[in-house]
């Protein structure tokens, strides 16, 4: 009887030891997994950053393109001052020079050149000391002539902005508005933007509501004969455009307002802050992009640039695509 009890106690002791070992092993595994996941999560967390670009003559010359880490609360001026030598006037709120390139004013109707800055492709509506940067923003400074008073309120060269990050952390809804014959081009563009993280819808011109027209980011796809595109073209000077269609030719202007080149056909990509916004087209709320041309083929070709070759429009204000050549305008 005593032997039986001893044997039973030994078995119980051994089972308890095994159970404790299993528990210890499981705890060790859990600790290891938790530590590994923590390390992995830390490695995958990207520090907040913005991209700053400095160009001249509507993006034709590139001085700087750099990704800069931000901690939060930095202004556009703070980051500019971090990457470049600058001088300011009017109490420090207006940039007079960047790396020695200084504002110029010839007087009268002569040359007037200054630094302008864009956030995600939209001409900023506040001074650089006032705009607080958000992670993902593109801060783009360009030095150009503005004697024409054609204020360029939006550019295409920071694509896919502003559809991805908007302005001041707010992104308007985006709609591709297309004519029936450009359904495939619109679908391809929608899929391309969605892959880049943009939330976007599609609709035919007849389906566009007045509210959407005023409040959305719009990408209009059709020929110059389209009613909305024709309305914008008729106000090209007020929208800051240097590309106009006179009913027969696409005409480009240089920065002085002189006729530069004319084309009997070609694809065109233009941008402006939304002129149908009741507040006006310089409130940095939404934009209108126009993907157009004289012929069906012109429009399709322009669409394909955005879908497959958008690196080619980097830093551009607007473009014409003719005879497989991209002309940056102005």
State each model region's role.
Residues 7-24, 32-34:
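N-terminal Sec-pathway targeting helices
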Residues 20-24, 38-39, 57-60, 64-66:
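Transition segments tied to proteolytic processing and entry into folded domains
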Residues 30-46:
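Sec-dependent signal peptide cleavage junction
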Residues 38, 135-330:
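Solvent-exposed alpha-helical segments and adjacent loops
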Residues 44-67, 161-165, 169-173:
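Eukaryote-biased recognition of intrinsically disordered, low-complexity regulatory segments
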Residues 77-131:
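Hydrophobic, secondary-structure "cap" segments at the distal end of domains
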């Amino acid at each position: 009887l005593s032997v039986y009890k001893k044997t039973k106690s030994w078995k119980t002791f051994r089972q308890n030891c095994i159970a404790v070992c299993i528990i210890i092993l499981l705890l060790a595994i859990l600790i290891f997994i938790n530590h590994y996941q923590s390390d992995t999560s830390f490695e995958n967390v990207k520090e907040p950053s913005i991209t700053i670009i400095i160009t001249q003559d509507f993006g034709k010359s590139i001085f700087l393109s750099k990704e800069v880490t931000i901690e939060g609360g930095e202004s556009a001026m703070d980051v500019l001052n971090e990457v470049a030598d600058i001088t300011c006037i009017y109490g420090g709120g207006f940039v007079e020079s960047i790396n020695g390139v200084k504002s110029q004013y010839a007087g009268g109707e002569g040359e007037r050149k200054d630094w302008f800055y864009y956030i995600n492709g939209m001409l900023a509506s506040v001074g650089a000391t006032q705009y607080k940067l958000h992670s993902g923003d593109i801060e783009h400074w360009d030095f150009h002539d503005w004697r024409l008073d054609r204020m360029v309120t939006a550019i295409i060269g920071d694509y896919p902005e502003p559809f991805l990050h908007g302005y001041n952390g707010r992104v308007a809804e985006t709609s591709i508005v297309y004519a029936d014959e450009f359904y495939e081009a619109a679908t391809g563009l929608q899929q391309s933007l969605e892959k880049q993280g943009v939330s976007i819808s599609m609709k035919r011109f007849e389906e566009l509501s007045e509210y959407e027209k005023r409040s959305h980011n719009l990408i209009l796809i059709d020929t110059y004969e389209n009613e909305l595109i024709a309305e914008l073209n008729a106000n090209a000077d007020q929208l800051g455009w240097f590309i106009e269609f006179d009913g027969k030719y696409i005409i480009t202007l240089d920065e002085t307002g002189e006729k530069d080149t004319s084309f009997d056909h070609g694809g065109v990509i233009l941008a402006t802050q939304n002129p149908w916004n009741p507040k006006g087209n310089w409130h940095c709320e939404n934009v209108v992009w126009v993907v157009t041309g004289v012929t069906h083929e012109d429009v399709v070709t322009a669409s394909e640039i955005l879908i497959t070759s958008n690196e080619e429009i980097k830093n551009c204000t607007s473009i014409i695509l003719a005879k497989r050549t991209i002309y940056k305008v102005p």
